[in-house]
Amino acid sequence: YDHEGGIHTPMIAHWPNGIKSKGAISNTLSHLVDLMPTILDATKVKPQANSGGKPRIKWDGRSLLPSLQGKKQPDPAILFFHHAKGRALRSGKWKLVFNRDKGKKANWELYDLANDPNEIKDLAKVNPKQVQALAKIWEAREKVLVSRGKD
């Protein structure tokens, strides 16, 4: 199966006064974390500076308002997915997946999404340098998440 939870998922947006090109399809790379920044941007509401007496941490998401308005929007340089046991990182055509299937040793899987969008052929063993580079990014990200504490 693929590891695109919340990433490669259709979204239907209805906003007659804001979306000018009705019926348009966008292939903008996005994630669920982009919804809050998009809503705030569309409503011109500024996020609170503090939450519970603590400074608000920077959100992972970005506003998709430009895409909704028919403008070209570059894909994020890196996109993280972390839910339950599913973990993945997308960077350009690459996807690094931390696989922890029951009964198997936890390991990294690497997919070339440009040539294998269904994530069939794991390239981790034939491209260990790419795995190492992306794993380093992932591990730095994990430290940030752990330092934030539990949700």
Describe the role of every protein-language-model region.
Residues 8-9:
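Catalytic cores of eukaryotic secretory-pathway lumenal/extracellular enzymes that build
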Residues 13-14:
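Short beta-strand-to-turn element immediately C-terminal to the catalytic PLP-Schiff-base lysine
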Residues 116:
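Intrinsically disordered, low-complexity polar regions and short flexible loop motifs
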Residues 121-129:
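Active-site-proximal N-terminal segment of extracellular/periplasmic enzymes that hydrolyze or transfer
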